[in-house]
Amino acid sequence: MRLLVPLLLLVVLGGACAHTPQSTGLEGLRPVVEDFHQRIRWKDFRGAARYLVPESREVFLRARAERHDDRDLSITDFEVLDVQLAPDGMRATVVTRMQWMRLPSPSEQTATVTSEYVFRDKAWLLERMDEGPFAGEFP
């Protein structure tokens, strides 16, 4: 009887945890952030769109086509400066320094970009990005 109570408590609490969505934390977020930036750097916009929240994917791809980014946008460098996980582990803020050129301008631009990621459907997805070459394109 003495073992039965702790065992039942363990089963009940363990079952509750199994139904609570758990993010992968920073270990799961970092590769997503790196791969997203590599894909936009090498103009793999369709591959990069897989890291966006579903409601932003088509808008993002349409904007790339309309702006001829496969031809006119060159992301010359990026550096992830900071990654902060929200206390609940389901949201994250990523700060990146990005450098790019968009023709016809011959000037390289640099911006500190803040991106918001959300853990949804067992994956980290980019929800918002301010500044940078895609400023104003996320709802």
Regions found by a protein language model. Name each.
Residues 5-15:
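Bacterial N-terminal signal peptides
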Residues 15-42, 50:
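Short, low-complexity N-terminal intrinsically disordered segments enriched in polar/charged residues
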Residues 30-31, 45-91, 106:
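Short solvent-exposed beta->alpha transition segments
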Residues 35-43, 51-55, 101, 120-123:
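Structured segments of extracytoplasmic/periplasmic soluble domains
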Residues 87-139:
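Exposed beta-sheet edge and beta->alpha loop/turn motif
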